[in-house]
A protein has these predicted regions:
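Glycine/proline-rich active-site loop of Rossmann-fold NAD(P)-dependent oxidoreductases
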Residues: 112, 140, 152, 158-168, ...
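Mid/C-terminal beta-alpha module of Rossmann-like enzyme folds, strongest
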Residues: 14, 213-269, 273, 298
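Catalytic helix-loop patch of NAD(P)-dependent Rossmann-fold dehydrogenases
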Residues: 71-74, 78, 82, 105-172, ...
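A conserved pocket-lining segment of Rossmann-fold NAD(P)-dependent short-chain dehydrogenase/reductase
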Residues: 125-129, 169-171, 175-177, 184-209
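N-terminal Rossmann NAD(P)H-binding glycine-rich loop of SDR-like oxidoreductase domains
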Residues: 1-22
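NAD(P)H-binding glycine-rich loop region in Rossmannoid oxidoreductase-like domains
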Residues: 38-81, 92
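Rossmann-fold cofactor-recognition segment
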Residues: 28-40
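Amphipathic terminal alpha-helices
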Residues: 290-306
Length: 306
């Protein structure tokens, strides 16, 4: 029996549909009630359900975007940092395994030394490494609450991100989710709706691929720890726009900001994370995701408007 926390959100709904399609028994729980309620009530709910594993899809992202988190910091902190700590403690007491949906938005820019940011790299877009958005700061703090901390590597290398003892569950990092269904949370919907776009290079996660990969971690019992769950490769905003046009989904003329400074002065209240993640750890564990360009093209060829 799987306890599914946050089953009504964008990611949680996809996870619920996956479990239903596989005929896996699950019980839905409210993240807000867990964060604001007693640990005893949460523990009793898990015991009553006979839960053997918990998936936490709950979190606070802000609507329509992370700028909203700057105006609702209490709920953002509760959803992204307090809740994971409660889950870790109660599941630990009951010897229940867990998986937590984190975010790759705790990184920004290029990784020193090249390549994508790895799971063992300390975040560089966080409260400890500002500037960052409040959202990204709380997501990095959420990983700290789950036992991860910065450690020096020496020789001038970027600091490591290590668990204080040994990982007790999965930390699945999502990055800019999208799929084939028009939705305000869908990256492809956002790209089409913005008046002007920021040119950037990013890793992305196709939503159904993401939840399938997360569940495969549980099925295959891959080692606990952090995993960057992104479709292999990276794309620029221009490449995404070109695919949108190529597939006939939207033929409008897309406008771009001159640079990030232009974007920040005209359209944003808080800094944005743009980064590439290294997904090789997941692949080496035997969990394979299709390349990001293939996933984008499939989603656009099967595009369904709301």
């Amino acid at each position: 029996m799987i306890a599914l926390v946050g089953s009504t959100g964008y990611v949680g709904s996809a996870f619920r549909q996956l479990l239903e399609s596989k005929g896996v028994a699950f019980k839905t729980l409210s993240g807000r009630q867990i964060a604001n309620g007693s640990k005893k009530d949460f523990a009793d709910a898990l015991k009553d359900a006979g839960a053997t594993f918990l998936v936490n899809c709950a979190g606070y992202t802000g609507k329509p975007n992370v700028d909203a988190c700057e105006l609702d910091k209490g709920n953002c902190l509760d959803g992204n940092a307090v809740l994971p700590g409660v889950i870790r403690e109660v599941c630990g007491d009951l010897s229940i395994g867990w998986g937590h949906v984190s975010s790759g938005c705790i990184f920004g820019g290029e990784r020193p030394g090249g390549g994508g940011w790895r799971e063992d790299d300390a975040p560089n877009f966080s409260f400890r490494k500002p500037p960052c958005s409040f959202y990204s700061g709380t997501k990095a703090l959420g990983e700290e609450v789950l036992g991860y901390k910065e450690a020096e590597r020496g020789d001038g290398q970027w600091p490591a991100w290590e668990h204080e003892s040994s990982p007790e569950g999965y930390v699945w990092r999502l990055r800019i989710p999208f799929n084939h269904l028009d939705n305000p949370r869908n990256y492809l919907t956002k790209v089409q709706s913005y008046a002007t776009l920021l040119q950037a290079t990013n890793s992305l996660s196709q939503l159904e691929d993401f939840v399938a990969a997360c569940y495969e971690c549980v099925e295959k019992q891959v080692p606990y720890g952090i995993y960057n769950v992104t479709n292999p490769g990276a794309v620029t905003t221009s490449q995404v726009v070109d695919l949108i046009k190529k597939t006939g989904v939207n033929g409008k003329e897309f406008q771009f900001f001159e640079d990030e400074a232009d974007f920040m002065s005209k359209a944003a209240k808080t800094p944005r994370s743009n980064c590439v993640l290294d997904e090789s750890k997941l692949r080496d564990a035997g969990v394979i995701m299709r390349p990001v360009e293939e996933a984008l093209e499939w989603s656009l060829k099967n595009w369904r408007k709301a």
